[in-house]
């Protein structure tokens, strides 16, 4: 049986196995605390995420179970990789993942990114999304703080707690407001993987601009900001809205023509970057570009390699997600997943992403290392 050490971090009890030493707080969210620590077995730094009181409610237990299942199934260079999982004596769950130095949100809050980094990062985001979507998974909460980056320019998408199957009925409140797709705000009962592409488009715009494109103060203000730039929703979109009140709201909006997106980014922005942005930020999701097609866009030609943009081995099994389990049943299911992970030889971490297309990754890494140093992130 594993031995545990108990410490107090930011006023929170933090219990971890003796495999790990020197926990240091790096983040706190509504569902738990994240600390950096050193793994004495692998001799590598890790991020230890504490999920607090996962068995207190059926909804939290299901969210926890879903995240564990997804982390076990999704294996890709541009997705965060689970290294270990354990349940503490106080019945909190701890998930160890690889540790990356910073996140995109933190970087963007300090200084604008050089265009070459924006290009490389959106490529990796879309590469990860292509894989996620091929598994019939929608991330639903893509935002800069869920994009982790290290000093080698390696990028990984994290936080799959809100991820869902693409299905006929979907809940409306997902994604941080600035990055929320219009079909979610328009209370559609069905939406798909295109919501992640919209979020990625918002992230690309923010990298190019150095500030959010749609910084809405509330739900209504958010939609006004979108229509101020992209124009009124087309009839094809309005016809899919199921709420009469929402239809009335959309029809009451003043008539607005779409603006040229070149007016919302710096004057020296690459034409191809603007063109990709136009294809990602389309109000009608049925005509919005897919992650797979976006990878083929000329803007990403320096990195695009169809032989090294893998898809999942098959769709993720979502059969559990439609059922409502009692808390005790969910608890047994979570314990079973943890034991399964610990008792099965887990595949090695995906190799670091290294495009075979003709560019010099070492030069980009050196420049990014200097950028991080100048930003105080190293």
From Swiss-Prot:
Keywords: ATP-binding, Kinase, Magnesium, Nucleotide-binding, Nucleus, Serine/threonine-protein kinase, Transferase. The active site is at residue 141. It is an enzyme of class 2 (transferase). Signal peptide: none annotated. Activated by threonine and tyrosine phosphorylation. Its EC number is 2.7.11.24. Pfam families: Pkinase (PF00069). Residues 20-300 form the Protein kinase domain. Disruption phenotype: Increases the sensitivity to osmotic and oxidative stresses as well as to cell wall damaging agents when sakA is also deleted. Affects virulence when sakA is also deleted. The double sakA/mpkC deletion also abolishes mpkA phosphorylation. Its cofactor is Mg(2+). It catalyses: L-seryl-[protein] + ATP = O-phospho-L-seryl-[protein] + ADP + H(+); L-threonyl-[protein] + ATP = O-phospho-L-threonyl-[protein] + ADP + H(+). Mitogen-activated protein kinase (MAPK), part of the high-osmolarity glycerol (HOG) pathway. With sakA, plays a role in the osmotic and oxidative stress responses. Involved in paradoxical growth, the cell wall integrity (CWI) pathway and biofilm formation. SakA and mpkC collaborate during virulence and mpkC could act by modulating sakA activity upon exposure to several types of stresses and during cell wall biosynthesis. This is Mitogen-activated protein kinase mpkC. It comes from Aspergillus fumigatus (strain CBS 144.89 / FGSC A1163 / CEA10) (Neosartorya fumigata).
């Amino acid at each position: 049986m594993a031995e545990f050490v108990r410490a107090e971090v930011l006023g929170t009890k933090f219990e971890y196995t003796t495999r790990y030493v020197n926990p240091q707080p790096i983040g706190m969210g509504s569902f738990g605390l994240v600390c950096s620590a050193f793994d004495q077995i692998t001799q590598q730094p890790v991020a230890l995420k504490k999920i607090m009181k996962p068995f207190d409610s059926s909804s939290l237990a299901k969210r926890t179970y879903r995240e564990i299942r997804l982390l076990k199934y999704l294996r890709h260079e541009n997705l965060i990789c689970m290294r270990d999982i354990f349940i503490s004596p106080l019945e909190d769950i701890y998930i160890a993942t690889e540790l990356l130095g910073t996140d995109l949100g933190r970087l963007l809050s300090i200084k604008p990114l050089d265009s070459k980094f924006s290009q490389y990062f959106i490529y990796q985001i879309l590469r990860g999304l292509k894989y996620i979507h091929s598994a019939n998974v929608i991330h639903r909460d893509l935002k800069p703080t869920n994009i982790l980056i290290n000093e080698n320019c390696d990028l990984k998408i994290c936080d799959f707690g809100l991820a869902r199957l693409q299905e006929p009925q979907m809940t409306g409140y997902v994604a941080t407001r600035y990055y929320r797709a219009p079909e979610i705000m328009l209370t559609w009962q069905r939406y798909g993987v295109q919501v992640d592409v919209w979020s990625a488009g918002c992230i690309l715009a923010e990298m190019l601009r150095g500030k959010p494109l749609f910084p809405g103060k509330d739900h209504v203000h958010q939609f006004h900001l979108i229509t101020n730039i992209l124009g009124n929703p087309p009839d094809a979109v309005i016809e899919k809205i199921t709420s009469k009140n929402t239809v009335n709201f959309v029809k009451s909006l003043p008539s607005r023509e779409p603006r040229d997106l070149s007016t919302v980014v710096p004057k020296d922005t690459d034409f191809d970057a603007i063109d990709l942005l136009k294809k990602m930020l389309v109000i009608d999701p049925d005509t919005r570009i897919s992650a797979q097609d976006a990878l083929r866009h000329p803007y990403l030609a320096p990195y695009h390699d169809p032989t090294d943009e893998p898809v999942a081995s098959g769709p993720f099994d979502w059969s559990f997600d439609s059922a409502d389990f009692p808390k005790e049943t969910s608890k047994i299911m979570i314990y079973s997943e943890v034991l399964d992970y610990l008792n099965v030889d887990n595949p090695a971490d995906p190799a670091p992403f290294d495009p075979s297309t003709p560019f010099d990754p070492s030069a980009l890494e050196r420049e990014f290392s200097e950028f991080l140093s100048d930003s105080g992130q190293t």
